Amino acid sequence: MDKIIKSISTSGSFRAYVLDCTETVRTAQEKHQTLSSSTVALGRTLIANQILAANQKGNSKVTVKVIGDSSFGHIISVADTKGNVKGYIQNTGVDIKKTATGEVLVGPFMGNGHFVVITDYATGQPYTSTTPLITGEIGEDFAYYLTESEQTPSAVGLNVLLDDEDKVKVAGGFMLQVLPGASDEEISRYEKRIQEMPSISSLLESENHIESLLSAIYGEDDYKRLSEDSLAFYCDCSKERFEAALLTLGTKELQAMKDEDKGVEITCQFCNQTYYFTEEDLEKIINDSIK
């Protein structure tokens, strides 16, 4: 089961989130049938979104839009405070071969664009914040967003590793943030440790990557675990929700779907689930719309 562990240094100067998102990203790959580069790009976005949502409380939802001008197109993800995330990538078929070190290229196929975060506090007034893409690798873009938009210096590592058949082998990451009151000496020590830590890929490949990530982040500094929560790919779409959307269409358009198309099918962008509305279904919706 996927999970996120929240921790804090004993000094109270740093906090870190570490995540195992393997099943989450594997489910996304299966639902969208993404090829290698698209899988990694979508997976990194889902991981970043789960970190952002873990910072929220109540019934808040966080939408992340990675908007590029290259092969991937847009990547859209939505996460809630209960550990659920869903998402999709416009171009599922980017399949660029791995580099000599086994890494899958992402940045060149994201291109120029923006990292957009929309936080819905369930009050009817969502808050939107936008920062430019720095590298298109998503992890660096996420760290830049945290530092620039949320004014919190952060180190981030996100990745998705694939097996020889380009299926998800492991996915996860971390976020480390400086908290108010951290001394210059502490900041320098953590900066040095992050600069010298093994690559996120090598840490994810270790037998227990959650423990490896925590050890790499904190080193000899003491820390305590604050919480451990489950994570999952989950889409809240339903036939009823799409029926409500159809109700917003005009009677003329609904009648055309019934008479000319003999029904309609709608596919959810976030999970690829398809819903079918027969002529009888549409007749009922038409009758409901004119009541």
Swiss-Prot record:
Disulfide bonds join 235-237, 268-271. GO terms for biological process: protein refolding. GO terms for molecular function: protein folding chaperone; unfolded protein binding. The keyword Zinc applies. Under oxidizing conditions two disulfide bonds are formed involving the reactive cysteines. Under reducing conditions zinc is bound to the reactive cysteines and the protein is inactive. Keywords: Chaperone, Cytoplasm, Disulfide bond, Redox-active center, Zinc. It holds the Pfam family HSP33. It comes from the Bacteria. GO terms for cellular component: cytoplasm. Gene3D superfamilies: Hsp33 domain, HSP33 redox switch-like. It is found in: Cytoplasm. Belongs to the HSP33 family. PANTHER family: 33 KDA CHAPERONIN. NCBIfam families: PRK00114.1 (NF001033). Redox regulated molecular chaperone. Protects both thermally unfolding and oxidatively damaged proteins from irreversible aggregation. Plays an important role in the bacterial defense system toward oxidative stress. This is 33 kDa chaperonin. It comes from Streptococcus agalactiae serotype V (strain ATCC BAA-611 / 2603 V/R). The gene is hslO.
